[in-house]
Amino acid sequence: MIIYYILLFLSNILLSTSYYVKTVLLKTNFFQLIYYFANGKEGVGNITSVIEIIKTCLYFFLTSSVITILPILIIKYFKLLPLKKFIKKYTIILLVFSTLLTLKNYQLDKYIYYKLKKTNIYEKYYVDTNKAKVTAPSKKNNLILIYLESMETSLISKENGGTFTTSRIPELETILKENTNFSNTDKFGGPENITVASFTMGSLVSSSSATPVDINLFRGYSKKNIPLKNIKTLGDILKENNYNLKLIQGSPASFAGTDLYYKEHGNYEIIDYNKMKEKKYIDKDYQKWWGVEDKKLFEIA
């Protein structure tokens, strides 16, 4: 019978991870899972953040364990059914259910659909950046790109396309009003979010290369397998025009192959969390969640 109790244990682990994905990671998809499985092992975070994740999952694991064991205890106490026979069927059904639920929350169905779907978008619309002619002006301007992690237009006021009566990001909303913005609606909506550009590295790559990030479960990025090696990106174009390029971020750039991408495409000088400690911009033991908080990052920049 021990094998069936192991199945029960595995089911509760799956239910816990499913709960974490659904309530904490929210819109995590299978493309993202595969990408980070292959490329996200370095710079994943400090021990504090890992402990917080474990605590969140452990709470639900204990709760789900009590709930899933309860039917077995009821059957045993009231002798409603043959206990061994019930446990065998029950644990198998529970494992199947928890597996399907986990895959559903990771949007495996969408992953399969998009993998099988055929499209002519590249034949009709894609412009090969290696062949595109880009001419820099005689007087070149400075270019500063600021990426905001986990920021979305749903936080602005309903009047301008958000979901709140009072804006949660009034300063950013003012910037939207007073400057050029791009939207897929008649209000402030931002671009239409596509699956492979909905996570950090996917967004960085797609916005700087007009190309989706390469996702391969068994072939992560490395010095031998360079990200988008044959694609000319914004960094490549700027480097050709003698720009001095820097990537400044508050977390380790080794996570998800970020450093490999920016080194290959533009040979950026990378100033990340580890480099800031090395240059003594921050103390050796300085840590705010994943690294350096935005306010201090702007001061360093």
Regions found by a protein language model. Name each.
Residues 1-114:
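Transmembrane and membrane-interface helices of multi-pass
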